[in-house]
């Protein structure tokens, strides 16, 4: 029986490259030169600047760098800014994996579409199985049209 997996993964090397590009862009910008920093550790980017408006500009620089490296901006979760001495700090977390709630929504969406496929939650991925490859392609089209709030990839196709 043909099947595929729905996952939400990030290419860690591309994320590192995007953060490095954002750091270079920060050094190039005249209005932000020497006023802010990016720190990247384990899918968390900590932004440090002197004021709120600089943090907002830095978030936009980071989002642009991610998009240039073909990483969907939906995976970036920006937390609230907080004061740390004279500086303002803000964290941006890169989310990866499908949590239980999103997996349930994906399964429900597949069932609502009334396709001839079955969806099963398997940890941080959803396995979709069907009798024909055409049914799986319809399921992929339905999931691409669905706005889940997370970037979805389809892999592990089996015939």
Swiss-Prot record:
Keyword Nucleotide-binding assigned: yes
Domain of life according to the entry: Bacteria
Keywords tagged on the record: Nucleotide-binding
SUPFAM superfamilies linked to this entry: YajQ-like (SSF89963)
A GO MF label: nucleotide binding
Keyword Membrane: no
UniProt cross-references to Pfam families, sorted A to Z: DUF520
GO CC annotation: cytosol
Transmembrane intervals: none
Family: Belongs to the YajQ family.
Function per UniProt: Nucleotide-binding protein.
Protein name per its UniProtKB record: Nucleotide-binding protein PSPTO_4393
């Amino acid at each position: 029986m043909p099947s595929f997996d729905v996952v939400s993964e990030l290419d860690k090397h591309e994320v590192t490259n995007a953060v490095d590009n954002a750091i270079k862009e920060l050094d190039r910008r005249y209005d932000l030169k020497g006023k802010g920093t990016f720190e990247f550790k384990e899918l968390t980017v900590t932004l440090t600047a002197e004021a709120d408006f600089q943090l907002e500009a830095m978030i936009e620089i980071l989002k642009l760098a991610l998009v240039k490296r073909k990483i969907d901006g939906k995976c970036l979760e920006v937390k609230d800014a907080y004061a740390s001495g004279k500086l303002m700090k803000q964290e941006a977390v890169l989310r990866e994996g499908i949590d239980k709630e999103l997996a349930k929504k994906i399964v429900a969406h597949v069932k609502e579409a009334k396709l001839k496929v079955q969806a099963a939650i398997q940890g941080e991925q959803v396995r979709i199985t069907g009798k024909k490859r055409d049914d799986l392609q319809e399921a992929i089209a339905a999931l691409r049209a669905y706005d889940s709030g997370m970037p979805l990839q389809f892999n592990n196709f089996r015939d």
